From Swiss-Prot:
Belongs to the Bowman-Birk serine protease inhibitor family. It comes from the Eukaryota. Serine protease inhibitor. SMART domains: BowB. The keyword Disulfide bond applies. It comes from Hyacinthus orientalis. GO terms for cellular component: extracellular region. The record marks 20-21 as: Reactive bond for trypsin. Expressed in bulb (at protein level). This is Bowman-Birk type proteinase inhibitor A2.
Length: 69
């Protein structure tokens, strides 16, 4: 089975829950980052209520990310 190369994945500063696959490159995670716009491949983008007044979003589906170490 193949998966996307790490370099081509959306970046995520705070990866939350992840699958436990081997090798590690096969893992998919939920990104806990709150951003102005979800990445193109996100299949479940949810609006997050914040006090800033600006619309912010979080991708809540398991996706392939380039997680910050």
């Amino acid at each position: 089975q193949t998966w996307p190369p790490v370099e081509g994945r959306p970046s995520c500063k705070r990866c939350g829950a992840c699958t436990r696959m081997w090798p590690p490159e096969a893992n998919r995670c939920v990104c806990d980052d709150i951003v102005p716009q979800c990445h193109e491949g996100c299949s479940k983008c949810e609006k997050v209520d914040t006090r800033s007044g600006k619309p912010l979003y979080q991708c809540q589906s398991f996706e392939y990310y380039n997680c910050a170490a």
